[in-house]
Design a protein with these regions (language model features):
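Secondary-structure capping and domain/repeat boundary segments
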Residues: 1-171
Length: 171
C-alpha cells in the first residue's frame, strides 16, 4: 500500500525483509507438578531438553515423549530437541506407577517397612520377622487366613500393576 517512486532510468529493486519465527517448546506434566518452564528460540534451532524433573504422587517420572501416550519420540533431560518451524511443540511427561508391598503383622509387632517399586517388578520379601507374645511366626501369606500364597524371607514377590500388595503374618 505504500507509494514507490520509480527511478528515472533503469530498474529499482525492493528487497524482502525477513524475521525468523520465535517458537516454543512446552512441557506437559500430565498430572504431575514442577514441570520446566517453556523454552523459546528461533524456528528450527536446537534447544537442550530441561533437566528439571516433575513429581507426581505414587509415580516415577521416566522421561518426556512427543506424544501423550508415550508412542512418539522419547527425550531425557540434556537431550537436544529441534524446535518447530512455527508454533509450539509439546513434550509430555511419562510416568510409571509406584506400587507397594506392605506387611500386616496381624497382632504382632516389629514388621518390616513397606517396599516400593515399579508396577509388576520383583522385590525380595524382607527377612525381618515380627514377634507376638505366645506365638511362633510361620511366615507370610497373601491372604489373612493363610489360604493364599505363602512367602518366606528372601523369596521373590512380584508387585501388583497398581496399588498395594499385602503379606499377612501367619502365627
Amino acid at each position: 500500500g505504500a507509494t514507490y517512486t520509480l527511478p528515472n532510468s533503469g530498474t529499482g529493486t525492493l528487497y524482502a525483509q525477513w524475521q525468523i519465527n520465535t517458537v516454543t517448546l512446552a512441557y506437559d506434566p500430565q498430572g504431575g507438578s514442577g514441570e520446566p518452564s517453556d523454552q523459546t528460540g528461533d524456528a528450527a534451532s536446537d534447544v537442550t531438553v530441561s533437566s528439571t524433573v516433575p513429581t507426581r504422587d505414587s509415580y516415577t517420572f521416566t522421561g518426556w515423549d512427543t506424544v501423550a501416550d508415550g508412542s512418539g519420540t522419547d527425550y531425557s533431560g540434556g537431550d537436544t530437541y529441534t524446535l518447530p518451524n512455527s508454533g509450539t511443540d509439546t513434550l509430555y511427561a511419562q510416568w510409571t506407577p509406584i506400587v507397594a508391598l506392605t506387611y500386616d503383622p496381624q497382632g504382632g509387632s516389629g514388621e518390616p517397612g513397606d517396599q516400593t517399586g515399579d508396577a509388576a517388578s520383583d522385590v525380595t520379601v524382607s527377612t525381618t520377622e515380627p514377634t507376638r507374645d505366645g506365638y511362633t511366626f510361620l511366615g507370610w501369606d497373601t491372604a489373612a487366613d493363610g489360604s493364599g500364597t505363602d512367602y518366606s524371607g528372601g523369596a521373590t514377590y512380584t508387585l501388583p500393576n497398581s496399588g498395594t500388595g499385602t503379606l499377612y503374618a501367619q502365627w
